[in-house]
Curated annotation (Swiss-Prot):
Participates actively in the response to hyperosmotic and heat shock by preventing the aggregation of stress-denatured proteins and by disaggregating proteins, also in an autonomous, DnaK-independent fashion. Unfolded proteins bind initially to DnaJ; upon interaction with the DnaJ-bound protein, DnaK hydrolyzes its bound ATP, resulting in the formation of a stable complex. GrpE releases ADP from DnaK; ATP binding to DnaK triggers the release of the substrate protein, thus completing the reaction cycle. InterPro entries: DnaJ (IPR012724), DnaJ_C (IPR002939), DnaJ_domain (IPR001623), DnaJ_domain_CS (IPR018253), HSP40/DnaJ_pept-bd (IPR008971), HSP_DnaJ_Cys-rich_dom (IPR001305), HSP_DnaJ_Cys-rich_dom_sf (IPR036410), J_dom_sf (IPR036869). GO terms for biological process: chaperone cofactor-dependent protein refolding; DNA replication; protein refolding; response to heat. Residues 35-47 have a biased composition (Basic and acidic residues). NCBIfam families: DnaJ_bact, PRK10767.1. Its cofactor is Zn(2+). Binds 2 Zn(2+) ions per monomer. This is Chaperone protein DnaJ. Its main location: cytoplasm. Belongs to the DnaJ family. It comes from Polaromonas naphthalenivorans (strain CJ2).
Length: 380
């Protein structure tokens, strides 16, 4: 039987963003979670839950998603070295502690730790960093302040009020999970009493409220690679929120936001700028200087240059993070009309205008076509 399209499984279009995919998965996971579907409909919900989990695992991974978009299910076939493959109830139980574990009695993030206490991966953090075009092109090293969680100095990480002890959970007997029977099957779920920790704190620490950790801030060195573009993300492994019960910490994602530049606009590896020239230079030609990220460059303006003319400077753009060569710089010509003319200047321009008209020659590439259109319009 052919597998259902992963995008159809989650109910999202093929151009869906990572956030849209995550939201769709959360919605389906909560709808079909075993805790909410028991009895006759449990098997159907179980299958839908597993389908949603498999689709999310594929589409939330950039490399797997790219392979799937290009080759379909064959690109992520486990027999070819990728994909999730078929799962027994071990993988199904593992999914219980996924990204929505907090909804069903766990912590953020998640994995499941065998037959012992539930362990959960910490949540990911995001940080928006603004960089200038010059910094994006050349790369930079920066320091950022991010939240960190350290052992509470009062209870030393136990979560219990000094002088009191942590008790073993009487519901799961310290395992962090309880067994739930569904027909012939037995499925593990997070203990609702201790939320998977396997322990209870009768007298929580007043400083950390029983968490065992306090929130602080730390300075992190970040290397911005040369050529990075707006919207790209840098992953800092292990600098997210802490895990629970010995689980690994989450990651920090630094999202790059490119500041608006006074001169250039970026389009991939190419740069664009508007270059104003006088109408005398446009008519007679000449050499002008144009700005580049590396300094000044010269452009020869041929006589008769029209507004909107585009000049290309090869290799004067940006070398992207995945590019072998830098892009180009495109200079778009605008012709400026002089203002605040003196009487003498006005007289000279009028003489020039009359001289051109008397000559009878067409001095604009669009003039002949425009004149013919006017004659046809007025029936001349």
């Amino acid at each position: 039987m052919a597998k259902k399209d992963y995008y159809d499984t989650l109910g999202v279009p093929k151009n869906a963003s990572d956030e849209d995919i995550k939201k769709a998965y959360r919605k389906l996971a909560m709808k079909h979670h075993p805790d909410r579907n028991q009895g006759d409909t449990s098997k159907v919900s179980e299958d839908k839950f597993k389908e949603a989990k498999e689709a999310y695992e594929m589409l939330s991974d950039a490399q797997k998603r790219a392979a799937y978009d290009q080759y379909g299910h064959a690109g992520v076939d486990p027999n070819r070295g990728g994909g999730p493959g078929a799962e027994g109830f071990g993988g199904f139980a593992e999914a219980f502690g996924d990204i929505f574990g907090d909804v069903f009695g766990g912590q953020r993030g998640g994995a499941q730790g065998g037959g012992g206490r539930q362990v959960y991966r910490g949540g990911d953090l995001s940080y928006a960093m603004e960089v200038t075009l010059e910094e994006a092109a050349a790369g930079k090293e920066a320091q950022i302040r991010i939240p960190s969680w350290d052992d509470c100095g009062i209870c030393h990480g136990t979560g219990a009020k000094p002088g009191t002890k942590v008790a073993t959970c009487t519901t799961c007997h310290g395992h962090g999970v309880v067994q739930m029977r569904q027909g012939f099957f037995s499925v593990q779920q997070t203990c609702p009493q201790c939320k998977g920790s396997g322990k209870l704190i009768p007298s929580p620490c007043v400083a950390c409220h029983g968490v065992g950790k306090t929130k602080n801030n730390k300075t992190l060195e970040v290397k911005i690679p040369a050529g990075i573009d707006d919207g790209m993300r840098i992953r800092s492994t292990g600098n997210g929120e802490p895990g629970t019960n010995g689980g690994p910490p989450g990651d920090l994602y630094i999202e790059i936001r490119l500041k608006k530049h006074d001169i250039f606009e970026r389009d991939g590896d190419d740069l664009h700028c508007s270059m104003p020239i006088s109408f005398m230079t446009a008519a007679l030609g000449g050499e002008i200087e144009v700005p580049t990220l590396a300094g000044k460059a010269a452009i020869d303006i041929p006589e008769g240059t029209q507004a909107g003319k585009q000049f290309r400077l090869r290799g004067k753009g940006i070398k992207g993070v995945r590019s072998s060569y830098p892009g180009d710089l495109y200079c778009h010509i605008t012709v400026e009309t002089p203002v605040k003319l003196t009487e003498h200047q006005r007289k000279l321009l009028k003489e020039l205008d009359e001289s051109i008209k008397k000559g009878g020659a067409k001095h604009s590439p669009s003039e002949e076509g425009w004149t013919d259109k006017l004659k046809n319009f007025f029936g001349a």
